[in-house]
Swiss-Prot record:
Subcellular localization: Cell inner membrane
One CC-aspect GO term: plasma membrane
Gene giving rise to this polypeptide: lplT
Alphabetized HAMAP family for the sequence: MFS_LplT (MF_01585)
Organism: Klebsiella pneumoniae (strain 342)
Pfam family, one: MFS_1
Role noted for this protein: Catalyzes the facilitated diffusion of 2-acyl-glycero-3-phosphoethanolamine (2-acyl-GPE) into the cell.
Topology versus the membrane: Multi-pass membrane protein
Protein name: Lysophospholipid transporter LplT
SUPFAM superfamilies: MFS general substrate transporter
């Protein structure tokens, strides 16, 4: 825990392992807390329509604080920024444990997550460089997916046993993330001394948006990652209505198992990308993006469980192979132009706006009576065409 260190190019340095450990615990807590809080709301007889509002508040925090969190990450040592952000998550979980309105507590967690994201990705480019950055992103994505899987399951299982116990475990996990942050070396701030007045901060953020958008490589990365995560959150909701219609299974658990197959595939795809793609060969990931859309279309017409599981696993592999190189490209190019923290903050804004837009289109389709299978086919086709268009546009630029 030295006060100042130079970048260690080793992929498995103590600092890098501390970052991965902190990320696993933080993401585990996020997903476990969601299911534990939903169980609490059910126990307190909150109306069903109020449950999605939790996710909206979480996403809304990313959008609302996007102009500020990138500068926050770049103005201080990123390991300490991560610690403060996890402390906010701990505070939010603690509030829910002590009976504070769950929307207030979960909003605090969302603010912590918004502050955490630019720092957790930005620090990778400070701890390692070059092609190892792609591998570091693979480790980050793999640990995140593992945390999503285990956290979701743990939150649901513990909440079935005892809701308060589940909430306390979430708070303890966030506490563990805070402790893990202490082992991240205190690297120099990337951009110290920036103005903290509202107008200069917003001007700085939107200036970063313009800078990244004018650069062909970073624009390419921003559009690709936004499409991917917007599609990912939409697929999660699509599975809930698709399973009863296509498979005739009304269990609440089955959509969770199918989502788990996607997550496992992303881990495998992220590992493959770390070995096969470098910053100079990022375009290799684009066919995988097109195949994501094709896999969704093929999945939508399935009527039996085994092929559905297999296609979702394959979809996840394509997804992991697609997203990891794009993340690494944005971090590397953004670090030298607007700062890694600002680059990730801009990325978060794009991704969360894409989530809201895609969910809005999905909700509109469902509300006018489009069948789930048709929604899946249309969704997959639009995604494949969008990625293909992005690829062609990127090559021309």
């Amino acid at each position: 825990m030295s006060e100042s260190v130079h970048t260690n190019p080793s992929l498995y340095s103590k600092g890098m392992l501390a970052v991965i450990c902190a990320q696993f615990l933080s993401a585990f807590g996020d997903n476990a807390l969601l299911f534990a809080t939903l169980a609490l709301m059910k126990q307190l007889y909150y109306p069903e329509w109020s449950q999605p509002v939790l996710q909206m508040l979480f996403v809304g925090a990313y959008i609302l604080f996007a102009p500020f969190v990138g500068q926050f990450a770049d103005s201080f040592a990123k390991g300490r920024v991560m610690m403060v952000a996890n402390g906010l998550k701990l505070l939010g979980a603690g509030c829910i444990c002590f009976g504070v309105n769950p929307f207030i507590g979960y909003t605090l967690v969302g603010i912590g997550a918004a502050a955490y994201s630019p720092a957790k990705y930005g620090i990778l480019g400070e701890l390692t460089t070059g092609d190892k950055l792609v591998k570091a992103n693979g480790l980050m994505e793999s640990s995140t997916i593992a945390a999503i899987l285990l956290g979701s399951m743990a939150g649901g299982i513990l909440a079935d046993w005892h809701v308060l116990a589940a909430l306390i475990v979430c708070a303890l996990v966030y506490g563990g993330a805070v402790v893990a942050n202490l082992w991240i070396p205190r690297l120099p701030a990337a951009r110290p001394g920036q103005s903290w007045r509202f107008k200069p901060m917003t001007h700085s953020f939107f200036s970063a948006c313009r800078t990244l958008w004018r650069n062909g490589e970073t624009r390419f990365s921003l559009m690709g990652t936004s499409l991917f995560w917007g599609a990912g959150v939409t697929l999660r909701f699509l599975l809930v209505i698709w399973v009863p219609v296509a498979l005739g299974i009304t269990s609440n658990a089955m959509p969770t198992y199918l989502n788990a197959m996607v997550a496992v595939g992303i881990v495998l795809g992220a590992g493959a990308a770390a070995k096969l793609v470098t910053l100079e060969t990022v375009s290799r990931c684009m066919p995988a993006g097109i195949l994501i859309g094709i896999a969704v279309m093929a999945f939508a017409v399935q009527q039996s469980l085994l092929p559905a599981f297999g296609l979702l696993l394959l979809l996840g592999v394509f997804g992991g192979f697609f997203i990891v190189p794009l993340n690494a490209l944005l971090q590397e190019r953004g670090k030298h132009s607007v700062g890694a923290g600002n680059a990730i903050a801009v990325q978060n804004l794009g991704e969360n706006v894409a989530m809201l837009l895609m969910l809005g289109l999905y909700s509109l389709a469902v509300s006018v009576g489009v069948p789930p299978v048709a929604v899946g086919i249309g969704f997959g086709a639009v995604f494949a065409v969008a990625i293909a268009a992005l690829w062609v546009w990127g090559r021309r630029k």
